[in-house]
Regions:
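C-terminal motif of bacterial Sec signal peptides marking the signal peptidase cleavage site
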Residues: 15-18
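The canonical Cys-X-X-Cys-His
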Residues: 142-153
Length: 172
């Protein structure tokens, strides 16, 4: 009888082991994630991130000049939906910049990439709730992240806002 008990126990253990999920690892699956990083960091910035960021910055805040006071915030559901979609582009641009093949390092670059995504998420939430102050603050955070990253990784970059301000003062 002990043999029958041992055989039954062995059969039970084997059955349980056969039903359990196989261990998953990169080595056992043989396939690592593959990312298409054909676009350079500069192309991602110019073609993806900058247009979306410009939309957010151009849609938050106000202007007070000789013509008077003008709020820049969206005034329709469609307008808020559009800036929310552009904020989602900013979120994903942060992820795109963190991909292997684009990330410059695993240190500050990753912190800035994450900060970019966080600013985009903040802008998305503010657009969803149509909260003007939160939307403005999300734009400010986005500007801070962009400026800090450029100072750290490309200090020679021309800040187009400084250039535009210089052009305006030259007109005076």
């Amino acid at each position: 009888m002990p043999n029958t008990k041992h055989l039954l126990a062995l059969l039970t253990i084997t059955s349980i082991a056969a039903c359990s999920a196989p261990e998953s690892s990169e080595e056992s699956s043989g396939s690592a994630a593959v990312f298409n990083t054909t676009l350079t960091v500069q192309e991602v910035m110019a073609l993806v991130l900058e247009p979306a960021s410009d939309t957010l910055w151009g849609s938050g805040g106000w202007v007070l000049d000789a013509s008077g006071y003008e709020e820049l915030y969206p005034t329709t559901e469609e307008g808020w939906a559009f800036v929310r979609a552009q904020a989602a582009v900013v979120v994903e641009a942060g992820n795109m910049l963190a991909l292997p093949g684009r990330a410059v390092d695993n240190d500050a670059w990753m912190i800035y990439s994450e900060g970019l995504s966080e600013a985009g998420l903040n802008a998305m939430a503010a657009a969803q709730s149509q909260n003007k102050e939160d939307f403005f603050q999300a734009g400010a955070k986005l500007y801070s992240v962009c400026t800090a990253c450029h100072q750290a990784y490309n200090p020679d970059i021309n800040n187009r806002f400084d250039i535009e301000a210089g052009d305006e003062s030259a007109d005076d």
